[in-house]
Amino acid sequence: ESRGLGDVYKRQENKELISNISHDLKTPITAIKGYVEGIMDGVADTPEKMDRYIRTIYNKANEMNLLINELTLYSKIDTNRIPYNFTTISAKGYFGDCAEDLSVELESKGAEFTYRNFMDDDCKVIVDPEQLRRVINNIVSNSLKYTDKPKVEITMDVKDVGDFIQIELGDNGRGIAAKDLPFIFDRFYRADASRNSSKGGSGIGLSIVKKIVEEHGGNIWATSEEGVGTTMYFVIRKYQEVPVNE
């Protein structure tokens, strides 16, 4: 019986995925088609208009590419085929580099970014640098998507919590309703889907984030207040050398 229910849930998940993907691919395709038709009909009759049309087409194609990449990664996650390349690195140096990249990106989008690192210089972690950066970028991307205030504020704090390092990524966005908060890391879940559908997104981004954090031996959770903002927390274990008995 439990297997039967599992199959039902799986089919429901797949239906939701197909519905979300259909919507999210259709939106940029419709825009691309419209702008291409405009060029063909001679509407873009000045260099400025032509430049604007081509840039819009390029941006919409990028949106589609990002979605397809997310789906490919999800497929690998679902079959446990993500290739991890773990390495031992300085926590302060690694998260400092991540913050520097974020700072440049957020500044270009007019967002305010604050970074604080409370780790000792000699603290190390075993991580896959590329996959963990995906976690941070995905969370920040989500924050930008669901923040509708004139001044977007993003914070990143890295803290020492015993055997673990805790990373906190906060925003001043619209927040998540208490009823939705327990489910935001579930596959295909979109809080208040009717409102958020205009923002796109397949609803698999945070499930990917959760999987990567757990594969690092950590866990992830969130706190949120509607109208005030959301903070995502995740912890990963510190690297500790095991003394060798002589």
Kindly give the residue locations of the regions a language model identified:
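Short conserved segment of the HATPase_c
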Residues: 176-190
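Short alpha-helical segment of the dimerization/phosphotransfer core of two-component systems
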Residues: 59-64
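Conserved catalytic submotifs in the C-terminal HATPase_c
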Residues: 85-89, 107, 112-123
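Conserved glycine-rich
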Residues: 217-218
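Single conserved hydrophobic/aromatic residue that forms the stacking wall/gate
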Residues: 1-9
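Conserved micro-motifs of the catalytic ATP-binding
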Residues: 79-84, 124-127
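Short helix-loop "hinge" at the ATP-lid/N-box region of the Bergerat-fold HATPase_c
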Residues: 143-144
